[in-house]
Amino acid sequence: MSRNPIERCIRDSLDTYYRDLDGENPSNVYDMVLQAIERPLLETVMEWASNNQSLAADYLGINRNTLRKKLQQHGLL
């Protein structure tokens, strides 16, 4: 069972995804999920960090340069 609201939301979304496949085999689910969550995650954390990249990187537990690269990849800089 889900331990928190985020996990529950992901589980519910994946259940819907699998039901909507209508018998087709899924592919690249891991990449699909990561791509779907990364941009809103970055946007939300940057908002909570008042666009301070060092603080946002700390919140995410990643290096500031890694955060900057991800922000650029998503066109958020």
From Swiss-Prot:
Gene Ontology annotations of biological process type: regulation of DNA-templated transcription
InterPro entries linked: Fis_DNA-bd, Homeodomain-like_sf, HTH_Fis, Trans_regulatory_Fis
Keyword vocabulary terms for this entry: DNA-binding
UniProt entry tagged with the keyword DNA-binding: yes
Highest rank taxon of the organism: Bacteria
Keyword Heme attached: no
GO MF, one annotated term: sequence-specific DNA binding
Pfam families, A to Z: HTH_8
DNA bind region: 53-72
PANTHER family: DNA-BINDING PROTEIN FIS
Family note: Belongs to the transcriptional regulatory Fis family.
NCBIfam families: PRK01905.1
This protein's name: Putative Fis-like DNA-binding protein
Species this chain originates from: Ralstonia nicotianae (strain ATCC BAA-1114 / GMI1000)
